[in-house]
């Protein structure tokens, strides 16, 4: 999602370089957000560019360049925050480039849940192992048992979206891992850029293809949710490029994102 948000900013930058009217850029910004309505990081970054542009295509172009640079730096800085704060061993699941970078910098033993059905965790495990990290891969179903009997310094996961309530939308299995960590008295941290904090508390469930779970001939229903919602009270903190966000910090970031989104109301009023 971070990569898609950067691509959206590139589109906005390139269009701003060749058009001279604000209304066209408003339409571009609307289309970019409509194409990924559940992607908070994309909306937040586009809104930040538009909110400070004062209806100027030149300003949109320049601000988009600045925002791209900041976005490219944000994940690396968040990973550094996590590496500085945590101590191993670490448990995680699925794939996150920011989690990977944090774990490479931390260089502690890692247990990775494979993240069925597509097993994105294998990609993370292999990337860490190829860099010399001591890695154990296990099934999602085994994670609770592993956490109950082995010593871990923390659970570290990424995030698709963080709601203003502090609840975390991430790969299915994150909620179960967090519950298992709570039972084992292991703190759970999320590492992500602060732009993944959503301006509103809407959760958009997404289902994957049924054939990822079952491709037989029996007449049965398949539940294949791509993301789950982990309650914020199971999360010790959110580690970002600006340090650790507690619940109050998350609320303040969400409020700023809501403020940045108000450019659209002003644009609509002006156009009428």
Task: Label every model-predicted segment.
Residues 115-272:
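Conserved phosphate- and dinucleotide-binding cores of soluble alpha/beta proteins
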Residues 88-89, 109:
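Residues that mark the start of a beta-strand
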Residues 70-87:
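A short, well-structured juxtamembrane/interface segment
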Residues 61-65, 69, 76, 122-125, ...:
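Nucleotide/pyrophosphate-binding catalytic subdomain
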Residues 1-69:
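Long amphipathic alpha-helical segments
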Residues 2, 93-99, 117:
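Gly/Ser/Thr-rich loops at beta-strand to alpha-helix junctions
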Residues 96-107, 178:
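Histidine-anchored nucleotide/phosphate-binding helix
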Residues 27, 62-63, 109, 155-163:
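Glycine/charged-rich beta-loop-alpha catalytic/anionic-binding loops adjacent to active sites
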